A protein has these predicted regions:
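Outer-membrane beta-barrel channels and translocator barrels
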Residues: 13, 51-53, 120-124, 199-203, ...
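Transmembrane beta-strands of outer-membrane beta-barrel pores
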Residues: 22-28, 64-68, 107, 132-140, ...
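Extracellular/periplasm-exposed beta-strand and loop segments of Gram-negative cell-envelope proteins
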Residues: 28-38, 67-106, 137-187, 219-228, ...
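Transmembrane beta-strands of outer-membrane beta-barrel proteins
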Residues: 16-20, 58-62, 109-111, 126-134, ...
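N-terminal signal peptide c-region/cleavage motif recognized by signal peptidases
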Residues: 6-8
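Outer-membrane beta-barrel "beta-signal"
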Residues: 244-271
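Transmembrane beta-barrel domains of outer membrane proteins
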Residues: 47-49, 114-118, 195-197, 251-255
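Start-of-domain marker
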Residues: 13-61, 65
Length: 271
Protein backbone atom coordinates (compact mmCIF):
# COMPACT_ATOMS: atom_id res chain seq x y z
CA UNK A 1 0.00 0.00 0.00
CA UNK A 2 2.78 2.46 0.89
CA UNK A 3 4.54 1.63 -2.36
CA UNK A 4 1.32 2.29 -4.31
CA UNK A 5 0.82 5.64 -2.59
CA UNK A 6 4.41 6.60 -3.32
CA UNK A 7 4.00 5.71 -7.00
CA UNK A 8 0.73 7.65 -7.10
CA UNK A 9 2.41 10.74 -5.68
CA UNK A 10 5.28 10.56 -8.15
CA UNK A 11 2.88 10.10 -11.07
CA UNK A 12 0.85 13.21 -10.39
CA UNK A 13 0.62 15.85 -13.11
CA UNK A 14 -0.91 19.25 -12.43
CA UNK A 15 -1.71 21.72 -15.18
CA UNK A 16 -3.89 24.63 -16.23
CA UNK A 17 -5.81 24.24 -19.50
CA UNK A 18 -6.86 27.39 -21.34
CA UNK A 19 -9.20 26.80 -24.30
CA UNK A 20 -11.21 28.75 -26.84
CA UNK A 21 -14.31 26.80 -27.88
CA UNK A 22 -16.71 27.33 -30.76
CA UNK A 23 -19.64 25.41 -32.17
CA UNK A 24 -23.41 25.13 -32.39
CA UNK A 25 -26.16 25.55 -29.80
CA UNK A 26 -29.50 23.79 -30.23
CA UNK A 27 -32.45 24.46 -27.94
CA UNK A 28 -34.36 21.19 -27.71
CA UNK A 29 -38.11 21.72 -27.36
CA UNK A 30 -41.28 20.98 -29.32
CA UNK A 31 -43.39 24.11 -29.91
CA UNK A 32 -47.02 23.71 -30.90
CA UNK A 33 -46.26 25.65 -34.07
CA UNK A 34 -43.11 26.97 -35.70
CA UNK A 35 -39.72 25.39 -35.23
CA UNK A 36 -36.49 26.07 -33.35
CA UNK A 37 -33.30 26.65 -35.31
CA UNK A 38 -29.69 26.27 -34.15
CA UNK A 39 -27.41 29.16 -33.30
CA UNK A 40 -23.81 29.63 -32.23
CA UNK A 41 -21.79 28.76 -29.16
CA UNK A 42 -18.54 30.52 -28.18
CA UNK A 43 -16.72 30.16 -24.87
CA UNK A 44 -13.41 30.70 -23.11
CA UNK A 45 -12.44 28.03 -20.59
CA UNK A 46 -9.83 27.88 -17.86
CA UNK A 47 -9.52 24.54 -16.08
CA UNK A 48 -7.22 23.03 -13.47
CA UNK A 49 -6.41 19.36 -14.11
CA UNK A 50 -4.62 16.92 -11.87
CA UNK A 51 -3.80 13.36 -12.88
CA UNK A 52 -3.48 11.28 -9.73
CA UNK A 53 -2.08 8.34 -11.71
CA UNK A 54 -0.58 7.98 -15.15
CA UNK A 55 -4.02 7.50 -16.68
CA UNK A 56 -6.70 8.97 -14.39
CA UNK A 57 -7.44 12.32 -12.80
CA UNK A 58 -9.95 15.12 -12.35
CA UNK A 59 -10.57 18.67 -13.49
CA UNK A 60 -12.39 21.78 -12.28
CA UNK A 61 -12.58 25.25 -13.71
CA UNK A 62 -14.65 28.10 -15.07
CA UNK A 63 -16.21 28.87 -18.48
CA UNK A 64 -17.52 32.14 -19.86
CA UNK A 65 -20.00 31.37 -22.65
CA UNK A 66 -22.01 33.30 -25.23
CA UNK A 67 -24.86 31.32 -26.80
CA UNK A 68 -27.43 32.08 -29.49
CA UNK A 69 -30.46 30.27 -30.91
CA UNK A 70 -33.45 31.03 -33.15
CA UNK A 71 -37.16 30.34 -33.51
CA UNK A 72 -38.95 30.64 -36.87
CA UNK A 73 -42.67 30.73 -37.64
CA UNK A 74 -44.87 31.84 -40.54
CA UNK A 75 -48.36 30.79 -39.40
CA UNK A 76 -51.55 32.12 -37.82
CA UNK A 77 -52.71 31.22 -34.30
CA UNK A 78 -56.42 31.46 -33.53
CA UNK A 79 -57.37 31.72 -29.84
CA UNK A 80 -61.07 31.81 -28.79
CA UNK A 81 -61.69 34.58 -26.22
CA UNK A 82 -64.84 33.62 -24.33
CA UNK A 83 -64.30 35.42 -21.02
CA UNK A 84 -65.73 38.85 -20.38
CA UNK A 85 -64.25 41.16 -23.02
CA UNK A 86 -64.05 44.86 -23.78
CA UNK A 87 -66.50 44.31 -26.63
CA UNK A 88 -68.94 42.47 -24.40
CA UNK A 89 -69.13 39.46 -26.72
CA UNK A 90 -66.80 36.53 -27.50
CA UNK A 91 -64.35 36.77 -30.39
CA UNK A 92 -61.36 34.99 -31.90
CA UNK A 93 -57.91 36.47 -31.40
CA UNK A 94 -55.80 35.95 -34.48
CA UNK A 95 -52.03 36.19 -34.08
CA UNK A 96 -50.39 36.36 -37.50
CA UNK A 97 -46.68 35.57 -37.75
CA UNK A 98 -45.32 36.62 -41.16
CA UNK A 99 -41.83 35.23 -41.89
CA UNK A 100 -41.10 35.78 -38.20
CA UNK A 101 -37.77 34.97 -36.54
CA UNK A 102 -36.90 35.44 -32.88
CA UNK A 103 -33.25 35.35 -31.87
CA UNK A 104 -32.29 34.35 -28.34
CA UNK A 105 -28.96 35.27 -26.76
CA UNK A 106 -27.48 34.37 -23.39
CA UNK A 107 -24.23 35.11 -21.60
CA UNK A 108 -23.37 32.88 -18.67
CA UNK A 109 -20.63 31.73 -16.34
CA UNK A 110 -20.26 27.98 -15.81
CA UNK A 111 -18.22 25.83 -13.42
CA UNK A 112 -17.35 22.39 -14.85
CA UNK A 113 -16.19 19.55 -12.58
CA UNK A 114 -15.29 16.20 -14.10
CA UNK A 115 -13.23 13.02 -14.20
CA UNK A 116 -10.57 12.50 -16.87
CA UNK A 117 -8.69 9.61 -18.44
CA UNK A 118 -5.65 9.87 -20.69
CA UNK A 119 -3.52 7.71 -22.93
CA UNK A 120 -0.03 9.26 -23.00
CA UNK A 121 2.65 8.78 -25.62
CA UNK A 122 5.87 10.60 -26.39
CA UNK A 123 4.41 13.41 -28.48
CA UNK A 124 0.63 13.12 -28.13
CA UNK A 125 -1.65 12.64 -25.12
CA UNK A 126 -5.24 11.60 -25.79
CA UNK A 127 -7.54 12.84 -22.99
CA UNK A 128 -11.27 12.28 -22.50
CA UNK A 129 -13.48 13.56 -19.67
CA UNK A 130 -17.05 13.59 -18.41
CA UNK A 131 -18.65 15.68 -15.71
CA UNK A 132 -21.24 18.20 -14.59
CA UNK A 133 -21.50 21.94 -15.23
CA UNK A 134 -23.22 24.43 -12.95
CA UNK A 135 -24.11 27.62 -14.79
CA UNK A 136 -25.27 31.08 -13.77
CA UNK A 137 -26.80 33.26 -16.53
CA UNK A 138 -25.63 36.88 -16.47
CA UNK A 139 -27.76 38.08 -19.40
CA UNK A 140 -30.58 36.40 -21.38
CA UNK A 141 -32.23 38.45 -24.15
CA UNK A 142 -34.49 37.97 -27.13
CA UNK A 143 -35.28 40.14 -30.14
CA UNK A 144 -37.51 39.88 -33.19
CA UNK A 145 -34.80 39.84 -35.84
CA UNK A 146 -37.01 39.37 -38.91
CA UNK A 147 -40.63 39.51 -40.05
CA UNK A 148 -43.71 40.82 -38.22
CA UNK A 149 -46.31 39.69 -35.71
CA UNK A 150 -49.82 41.12 -35.84
CA UNK A 151 -52.89 40.59 -33.64
CA UNK A 152 -56.46 40.94 -34.91
CA UNK A 153 -59.88 40.36 -33.34
CA UNK A 154 -62.40 38.46 -35.45
CA UNK A 155 -66.11 38.61 -34.58
CA UNK A 156 -68.08 35.85 -36.28
CA UNK A 157 -71.75 34.93 -36.61
CA UNK A 158 -73.89 37.87 -37.71
CA UNK A 159 -71.13 40.43 -37.22
CA UNK A 160 -68.45 38.86 -39.47
CA UNK A 161 -65.92 41.63 -38.88
CA UNK A 162 -62.21 41.79 -38.12
CA UNK A 163 -60.59 44.59 -36.12
CA UNK A 164 -56.89 45.47 -36.17
CA UNK A 165 -54.41 48.18 -35.18
CA UNK A 166 -56.08 49.20 -31.91
CA UNK A 167 -53.08 49.02 -29.54
CA UNK A 168 -55.04 50.07 -26.45
CA UNK A 169 -57.04 46.83 -26.84
CA UNK A 170 -54.04 44.63 -27.57
CA UNK A 171 -54.43 44.72 -31.36
CA UNK A 172 -51.19 45.79 -32.99
CA UNK A 173 -48.66 45.08 -35.72
CA UNK A 174 -45.09 44.89 -34.61
CA UNK A 175 -41.92 44.38 -36.60
CA UNK A 176 -39.39 44.76 -33.82
CA UNK A 177 -39.36 43.91 -30.16
CA UNK A 178 -36.73 42.96 -27.61
CA UNK A 179 -36.55 42.17 -23.94
CA UNK A 180 -35.40 39.81 -21.23
CA UNK A 181 -36.03 36.08 -21.17
CA UNK A 182 -37.34 34.83 -17.82
CA UNK A 183 -34.56 32.32 -17.34
CA UNK A 184 -33.71 29.89 -14.56
CA UNK A 185 -30.88 31.29 -12.48
CA UNK A 186 -29.34 27.84 -12.03
CA UNK A 187 -28.39 25.91 -15.16
CA UNK A 188 -27.25 22.29 -14.81
CA UNK A 189 -25.77 20.20 -17.61
CA UNK A 190 -23.75 17.08 -18.33
CA UNK A 191 -20.65 17.54 -20.45
CA UNK A 192 -18.07 15.46 -22.22
CA UNK A 193 -14.91 16.53 -23.97
CA UNK A 194 -11.93 14.95 -25.60
CA UNK A 195 -8.65 16.37 -26.77
CA UNK A 196 -5.36 15.52 -28.33
CA UNK A 197 -2.48 17.29 -26.59
CA UNK A 198 0.51 17.75 -28.89
CA UNK A 199 3.86 18.22 -27.14
CA UNK A 200 6.83 20.02 -28.69
CA UNK A 201 10.24 20.30 -26.96
CA UNK A 202 8.70 18.83 -23.79
CA UNK A 203 7.00 22.03 -22.66
CA UNK A 204 4.84 23.58 -25.38
CA UNK A 205 1.60 21.60 -25.31
CA UNK A 206 -1.14 22.56 -27.76
CA UNK A 207 -4.45 20.75 -27.54
CA UNK A 208 -7.21 20.30 -30.07
CA UNK A 209 -10.48 18.51 -29.47
CA UNK A 210 -14.26 18.52 -29.26
CA UNK A 211 -16.91 19.07 -26.60
CA UNK A 212 -20.57 18.25 -25.99
CA UNK A 213 -23.03 19.36 -23.30
CA UNK A 214 -26.66 18.49 -22.56
CA UNK A 215 -28.90 20.49 -20.23
CA UNK A 216 -30.51 18.72 -17.27
CA UNK A 217 -33.14 21.28 -16.23
CA UNK A 218 -35.52 23.67 -17.96
CA UNK A 219 -33.63 26.67 -19.30
CA UNK A 220 -36.49 29.09 -18.54
CA UNK A 221 -38.49 29.72 -15.38
CA UNK A 222 -42.04 29.77 -16.82
CA UNK A 223 -44.20 29.01 -19.86
CA UNK A 224 -47.26 31.15 -19.14
CA UNK A 225 -47.10 34.02 -21.67
CA UNK A 226 -49.66 34.11 -24.50
CA UNK A 227 -47.95 34.97 -27.78
CA UNK A 228 -49.57 37.98 -29.41
CA UNK A 229 -50.98 39.31 -26.13
CA UNK A 230 -47.88 39.37 -23.95
CA UNK A 231 -44.79 40.57 -25.79
CA UNK A 232 -42.49 37.87 -24.50
CA UNK A 233 -39.99 35.41 -25.86
CA UNK A 234 -41.37 32.25 -27.45
CA UNK A 235 -39.36 30.38 -24.81
CA UNK A 236 -41.64 31.77 -22.07
CA UNK A 237 -44.86 31.22 -24.01
CA UNK A 238 -47.57 28.61 -23.62
CA UNK A 239 -46.49 27.23 -27.01
CA UNK A 240 -43.41 25.57 -25.52
CA UNK A 241 -42.58 22.95 -22.93
CA UNK A 242 -39.23 22.17 -21.31
CA UNK A 243 -36.31 23.94 -23.01
CA UNK A 244 -33.09 21.88 -23.04
CA UNK A 245 -29.88 23.54 -24.31
CA UNK A 246 -27.47 21.33 -26.26
CA UNK A 247 -24.01 22.47 -27.36
CA UNK A 248 -21.46 20.74 -29.58
CA UNK A 249 -18.25 22.08 -31.05
CA UNK A 250 -14.47 22.18 -31.26
CA UNK A 251 -11.84 23.46 -28.85
CA UNK A 252 -8.28 24.73 -29.22
CA UNK A 253 -5.89 25.81 -26.51
CA UNK A 254 -2.77 25.48 -24.40
CA UNK A 255 -1.87 23.57 -21.24
CA UNK A 256 0.48 25.11 -18.69
CA UNK A 257 2.26 22.46 -16.56
CA UNK A 258 2.48 23.24 -12.86
CA UNK A 259 4.29 20.25 -11.41
CA UNK A 260 4.90 16.53 -11.79
CA UNK A 261 5.41 14.67 -8.56
CA UNK A 262 7.50 16.30 -5.86
CA UNK A 263 10.56 17.27 -7.91
CA UNK A 264 9.19 19.07 -10.93
CA UNK A 265 8.93 22.80 -11.54
CA UNK A 266 6.83 24.72 -14.04
CA UNK A 267 9.79 24.79 -16.45
CA UNK A 268 10.34 21.03 -16.62
CA UNK A 269 7.86 20.25 -19.37
CA UNK A 270 5.74 17.16 -19.78
CA UNK A 271 8.21 14.24 -19.74
Amino acid sequence: MLLFLAQMTLAQDKMINISVNGGVEILKYTPEIGKPKPGGSVSVECQFQQFLTKNFGYGAGIDISYLTANYYISETIETPITDETDAGIPYTLRTIFDDFNEKQRSFLVEAPVGLYARVPSRYVHFIVGVGVKVGYPIVAKYDYSRGTVETRAYFGDDIDAELSKIPQHGLYKQGTNAGDIDINRLQLSLYSDMMWRFIFKDATPIHFGAYFSYGLNDMVSNHDATMGIHKNSILNSTLTDKIVPICIGLKLGLAIPLEKGVKRSIFDGFR
